[in-house]
Curated annotation (Swiss-Prot):
Gene expressing this chain: mscL
Protein name in UniProt: Large-conductance mechanosensitive channel
Species name: Escherichia coli (strain K12)
UniProt topology in membrane: Multi-pass membrane protein
InterPro entries the record matches: Mechanosensitive_channel_CS, MS_channel, MSC/AndL, MscL_channel
Membrane-crossing residue ranges in chain numbering: 17-45, 75-94
Protein family per UniProt: Belongs to the MscL family.
Length: 136
Protein backbone atom coordinates (compact mmCIF):
# COMPACT_ATOMS: atom_id res chain seq x y z
CA UNK A 1 0.00 0.00 0.00
CA UNK A 2 1.46 3.34 -0.98
CA UNK A 3 2.09 6.04 1.59
CA UNK A 4 -0.28 8.43 -0.18
CA UNK A 5 -3.09 5.87 -0.10
CA UNK A 6 -2.43 5.13 3.59
CA UNK A 7 -2.41 8.83 4.41
CA UNK A 8 -5.66 9.38 2.49
CA UNK A 9 -7.35 6.56 4.44
CA UNK A 10 -6.01 7.96 7.71
CA UNK A 11 -7.11 11.52 6.92
CA UNK A 12 -10.59 10.47 5.84
CA UNK A 13 -11.38 8.53 9.00
CA UNK A 14 -14.27 10.05 10.90
CA UNK A 15 -12.30 11.04 14.00
CA UNK A 16 -9.58 12.92 12.12
CA UNK A 17 -12.07 14.84 10.01
CA UNK A 18 -14.20 15.61 13.08
CA UNK A 19 -11.12 16.86 14.92
CA UNK A 20 -10.11 19.09 12.01
CA UNK A 21 -13.59 20.58 11.80
CA UNK A 22 -13.59 21.13 15.57
CA UNK A 23 -10.25 22.93 15.48
CA UNK A 24 -11.35 25.20 12.62
CA UNK A 25 -14.66 26.04 14.27
CA UNK A 26 -12.89 26.55 17.60
CA UNK A 27 -10.47 29.05 16.05
CA UNK A 28 -13.34 30.97 14.47
CA UNK A 29 -15.27 30.88 17.74
CA UNK A 30 -12.21 32.24 19.56
CA UNK A 31 -12.12 35.23 17.22
CA UNK A 32 -15.82 35.88 17.80
CA UNK A 33 -15.37 35.72 21.57
CA UNK A 34 -12.33 38.00 21.45
CA UNK A 35 -14.32 40.54 19.48
CA UNK A 36 -17.26 40.19 21.87
CA UNK A 37 -15.03 40.89 24.84
CA UNK A 38 -12.91 43.63 23.25
CA UNK A 39 -15.64 45.44 21.33
CA UNK A 40 -18.86 44.80 23.27
CA UNK A 41 -18.15 43.93 26.92
CA UNK A 42 -15.00 45.86 27.82
CA UNK A 43 -16.01 49.35 26.55
CA UNK A 44 -19.17 49.58 28.73
CA UNK A 45 -17.27 48.03 31.64
CA UNK A 46 -14.54 50.63 31.21
CA UNK A 47 -17.20 53.35 31.02
CA UNK A 48 -18.78 52.13 34.26
CA UNK A 49 -15.48 52.42 36.08
CA UNK A 50 -14.64 55.85 34.74
CA UNK A 51 -14.06 55.61 30.99
CA UNK A 52 -11.02 53.39 31.34
CA UNK A 53 -9.69 51.34 28.41
CA UNK A 54 -8.33 48.13 29.90
CA UNK A 55 -5.87 47.69 27.02
CA UNK A 56 -4.07 50.80 28.22
CA UNK A 57 -3.35 49.41 31.70
CA UNK A 58 0.38 48.85 31.89
CA UNK A 59 3.37 49.19 34.15
CA UNK A 60 6.63 50.48 32.72
CA UNK A 61 9.45 48.45 34.20
CA UNK A 62 12.20 50.34 32.37
CA UNK A 63 11.93 53.47 30.24
CA UNK A 64 13.19 53.54 26.69
CA UNK A 65 16.87 54.39 26.42
CA UNK A 66 18.08 55.39 22.98
CA UNK A 67 17.43 52.52 20.57
CA UNK A 68 16.34 50.18 23.36
CA UNK A 69 12.54 50.14 23.69
CA UNK A 70 10.83 50.45 27.04
CA UNK A 71 10.07 47.29 29.00
CA UNK A 72 6.33 47.38 29.67
CA UNK A 73 4.05 44.90 31.40
CA UNK A 74 0.60 45.21 29.75
CA UNK A 75 -1.63 43.79 32.46
CA UNK A 76 -4.73 45.37 30.87
CA UNK A 77 -4.36 43.05 27.89
CA UNK A 78 -4.04 40.18 30.36
CA UNK A 79 -7.30 41.24 32.06
CA UNK A 80 -9.01 41.27 28.68
CA UNK A 81 -7.63 37.80 27.87
CA UNK A 82 -8.94 36.53 31.22
CA UNK A 83 -12.40 37.79 30.23
CA UNK A 84 -12.00 36.02 26.86
CA UNK A 85 -11.10 32.79 28.62
CA UNK A 86 -13.97 32.99 31.08
CA UNK A 87 -16.51 33.57 28.33
CA UNK A 88 -15.13 30.73 26.19
CA UNK A 89 -15.02 28.39 29.20
CA UNK A 90 -18.61 29.28 30.11
CA UNK A 91 -19.81 28.80 26.52
CA UNK A 92 -18.10 25.40 26.30
CA UNK A 93 -19.51 24.42 29.70
CA UNK A 94 -23.04 25.29 28.55
CA UNK A 95 -22.57 23.41 25.26
CA UNK A 96 -21.30 20.28 27.06
CA UNK A 97 -24.13 20.55 29.57
CA UNK A 98 -26.66 20.68 26.71
CA UNK A 99 -25.02 17.73 24.94
CA UNK A 100 -25.03 15.67 28.15
CA UNK A 101 -28.69 16.51 28.72
CA UNK A 102 -29.57 15.39 25.19
CA UNK A 103 -27.53 12.19 25.61
CA UNK A 104 -29.27 11.40 28.90
CA UNK A 105 -32.62 11.56 27.16
CA UNK A 106 -31.35 9.12 24.52
CA UNK A 107 -30.01 6.75 27.17
CA UNK A 108 -33.27 6.40 29.08
CA UNK A 109 -33.95 2.69 29.31
CA UNK A 110 -36.38 1.37 26.77
CA UNK A 111 -39.33 -0.69 27.90
CA UNK A 112 -38.47 -4.33 28.47
CA UNK A 113 -39.06 -6.32 25.31
CA UNK A 114 -42.12 -8.52 25.23
CA UNK A 115 -41.34 -12.09 26.26
CA UNK A 116 -40.92 -14.61 23.49
CA UNK A 117 -43.36 -17.48 23.02
CA UNK A 118 -40.85 -19.84 24.60
CA UNK A 119 -40.52 -17.64 27.68
CA UNK A 120 -44.31 -17.43 28.04
CA UNK A 121 -44.63 -21.22 27.77
CA UNK A 122 -41.81 -21.81 30.25
CA UNK A 123 -43.42 -19.37 32.70
CA UNK A 124 -46.75 -21.20 32.42
CA UNK A 125 -45.05 -24.57 32.95
CA UNK A 126 -43.23 -23.22 36.01
CA UNK A 127 -46.46 -21.87 37.47
CA UNK A 128 -48.24 -25.21 36.86
CA UNK A 129 -45.41 -27.12 38.55
CA UNK A 130 -45.57 -24.78 41.57
CA UNK A 131 -49.32 -25.39 41.85
CA UNK A 132 -48.81 -29.15 41.73
CA UNK A 133 -46.14 -28.98 44.44
CA UNK A 134 -48.35 -26.82 46.65
CA UNK A 135 -51.26 -29.33 46.36
CA UNK A 136 -49.12 -32.25 47.38
Amino acid sequence: MSIIKEFREFAMRGNVVDLAVGVIIGAAFGKIVSSLVADIIMPPLGLLIGGIDFKQFAVTLRDAQGDIPAVVMHYGVFIQNVFDFLIVAFAIFMAIKLINKLNRKKEEPAAAPAPTKEEVLLTEIRDLLKEQNNRS
